[in-house]
């Protein structure tokens, strides 16, 4: 049995819960009607593009998943697995009356997650033997109402951060705390371990760098604080000696890993009188592919920038909260209007658009059919809805191939 089978399903559900929570303020728009090929006045397929040019990158099987979106570039691309969305088995039990925004992690056959009562629990996937069960919540609380922050693994160590400003290093072998550090603001992003440093973003729009070995703060940088933000924030990405952080005011800023010196900055939000009253947060993780970084804001644009100097390659007026998937020369994403979009990575032109069901019945918020994904698995795109539907879509033309309700 493929060990990733259980984890893949749990991962998708975890990201799905994050998607539901990130859209707590919703305004209904009853005038969203779309014509063929032009689904809005601002977004349309590029007629000159040929869908036959779409070629998927080589799929690969992941043996571990030690952070949210697997790697420091947040680029999971094309997944190869024998897992199926059938015969699902429960590894962890829990309740549905709370929100858990922390994605589980998988390493060396172990699956770890944070429970409502503030316990970090790790189990062997095969056999379900419990290897870690420790209380990591703040001493002043009984349980989490909303589980925010994140966990990541490296070198026999789990790093945990939460919305109470806690940062803890936990030894996997003996479940003991190596060190712990406290900051004054909630931590809303999952941590990133990179080059012996721990990076995360706090609610006051500050990126921190801590020593992986001691927990000592190496450097920090604060940009303009934003009062309107989602329940969670996207995580930093890194490549070579560059760490790039997405902030809740729509900014992305590149820093030198060693000393935190800013290198370049960009703003993904559309600036206008109207947009100043809306969320400009970035909840979709930026993705690094090749020499470019691709950033999607909750109320703004999808932007491609050079990693080296931040020069803008192109931008498209698309808003979304789900991390894009990049395979070969295509970007796949779902926007806030429940449209699955395939974009040319080099130019920002649109190959195809597939509109999904935005509301199940009525147009009020309780009937809003939030979608998570897409995930490119075994040459198919998969999306999961708020109501538990699983869609299978062709990555070549956007055709809906299967709908499991």
Tell where the protein language model's regions lie, with residue ranges.
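Bacterial signal peptide processing site
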Residues: 21-24
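Blade/loop signatures of beta-propeller domains
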Residues: 29-45, 51-88
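Extracytoplasmic beta-rich repeat domains
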Residues: 85-105, 129-152, 178-195, 217-240, ...
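Structural signature of WD-repeat beta-propellers
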Residues: 108, 115-116, 155, 162-163, ...
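Short loop/turn segments that connect beta-strands within beta-propeller blades
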Residues: 124-128, 171-175, 211-215, 256-260, ...
